[in-house]
């Protein structure tokens, strides 16, 4: 499970060091793709494969399903962390997420999200008031 918030730096070559506690779970390879709210999503290869298969099984006659599959496939980069636990983020991914040197990596249970630090702070501030309401929507009667 991917949990927590980390603040790695993006180096001049576009490399980001993944949190040490997640490296074993990502050792079999990982997929970096465009995420929600201009973040990047990082999936273990197996998790991404299941997601991609589910997306591909959607009706090909549905324009929204086709658009999602195209965006997912075209916007994904397969990576393997180096010996120092770094991955290289493509220029397109860095541009999409507006990444500067200061980044935030957050655990999102079954995947990671990579955010520009300022964008993450803005998102958190804008959504603090909605957290209680979102909890009820996401978990319903569980909480």
From Swiss-Prot:
Broad class of the protein's primary localization: cytoplasm
A Gene Ontology biological process term: negative regulation of DNA-templated transcription initiation
SpoVT-AbrB domain residues: 5-47, 76-119
Keywords in alphabetical order: Cytoplasm, DNA-binding, Repeat, Transcription, Transcription regulation
Gene Ontology terms: cellular component: cytoplasm; nucleoid
CDD domains (UniProt xref): MraZ_C, MraZ_N
InterPro entries linked: MraZ (IPR003444), MraZ_C (IPR035644), MraZ_dom (IPR020603), MraZ_N (IPR035642), MraZ_sf (IPR038619), SpoVT-AbrB_dom (IPR007159), SpoVT-AbrB_sf (IPR037914)
Pfam families tied to this protein: MraZ (PF02381)
Keyword DNA-binding tagged: yes
Compartments in which it is found: Cytoplasm, Nucleoid
SUPFAM superfamilies, A to Z: AbrB/MazE/MraZ-like
GO molecular-function terms, A-Z: DNA-binding transcription factor activity; transcription cis-regulatory region binding
Alphabetized PANTHER family for the sequence: TRANSCRIPTIONAL REGULATOR MRAZ (PTHR34701:SF1)
Description of how the protein assembles with itself and partners: Forms oligomers.
Family: Belongs to the MraZ family.
Name of protein: Transcriptional regulator MraZ
Gene: mraZ
